[in-house]
Structures are given as C-alpha cells and as structure tokens.
Design a protein with these regions (language model features):
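Acidic (Asp/Glu-rich) sequence patches and key acidic residues
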Residues: 38, 49-52, 64-65
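Short, low-complexity, polybasic intrinsically disordered segments
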Residues: 104-157
Length: 159
C-alpha cells in the first residue's frame, strides 16, 4: 500500500502510514471502468472510521485567480456534496462498512475558522444527516462532516 499521497498540485502530502487502508485511486478506478463521476480525493480507513477526504487549496502560488474562488457558492456546495454521494459506491464495492466522516480540507484567500464552520453547516444541510434521522434504523451513510484548514487537519488527532 502506498502510504504517502501527494495532492494534485504537488505542494502537500497526506501521510497515511498509520492507516488500516487508504487510496487515492478512486478517480482512476472509475475512469478505467468508463464511469465519470465526481469523487473525493482520498479515502482513508483508520481503526474506527472511513475518512472521505476532499482537498482544495486556492492559496498556492500557482493558483490561477484565487480571489475568484468562493466556496460558499451554490455550485461549489453542490459539487462538494455530489463528491460525497458519488464516492459512497466505491466504499460499498470494497465492502467498507465503518462509519464515514467527510473531511473537506480547504485553504482559500480570507478563509478562517468562522467561514469554514459556516461552510460545514451548509454542507450538513445537503448531506444525508436529516434523512438518516427521519428514516431511522438502517446503517448511517455519514457520521460527521468537517471543513478544516491544513493546520487544523494536521492538529486533529482523530483524522
């Protein structure tokens, strides 16, 4: 198993040496099967959970027009939400049944803890939290969603 994943810009890595299982091949696997979806960047299994990790960094020096990135736009929310739903199939095909946390690692100009919490709350409205409560007794699709900076991700011992 590859233990160190490099994000698409080559600027940061995610160390998964302590993971039970991890992959950054979800997009490649779907593409090879002729299926075009919106998927998360990384899937990481620890001892208790599956982490679906989406990464976006508009603060890189190579970012084109980072001020134009607005993560609270309806279209951006829709894409991030769809990545969660589209990636659930992959976990099912691999018979990964642990509870799921959806983690959005986000860096963008003027981003702060308050805006990330607002975004997290907005995502909660689009993800199946209320559906799980309304329907009830089956397996939960998601247990937690967080929007974190790189520093917050690095400091969170549960991730």
């Amino acid at each position: 198993m590859k233990n160190l994943f490099i994000e698409e810009n080559g600027a940061y890595s995610i160390d998964c040496k302590a993971a039970v299982w991890a992959t950054d091949k979800i997009h490649e696997d779907y593409h090879n099967a002729g299926i075009h979806i919106n998927d998360v960047d990384f899937l990481i299994e620890n001892s208790t959970h599956i982490l679906m990790v989406e990464y976006k960094n508009a603060c890189l020096a190579s970012a084109k027009n980072p001020e134009a990135f607005h993560p609270m736009e309806d279209k951006k929310i829709s894409i991030i939400t769809r990545k969660f739903y589209d990636s659930l199939h992959y976990l099912r095909l691999l018979d990964k049944t642990k509870p799921v946390w959806y983690i959005y690692i986000l860096e963008y100009p003027n981003g702060d803890v308050t805006t990330r919490k607002r975004l997290r709350n907005r995502l909660k409205m689009e993800l199946p939290f209320s559906l799980q409560e309304n329907i009830g007794n089956g397996k939960r699709l998601i247990d937690r969603v967080d929007v974190l900076s790189i520093d917050e991700w690095n400091a969170d011992s549960q991730c």
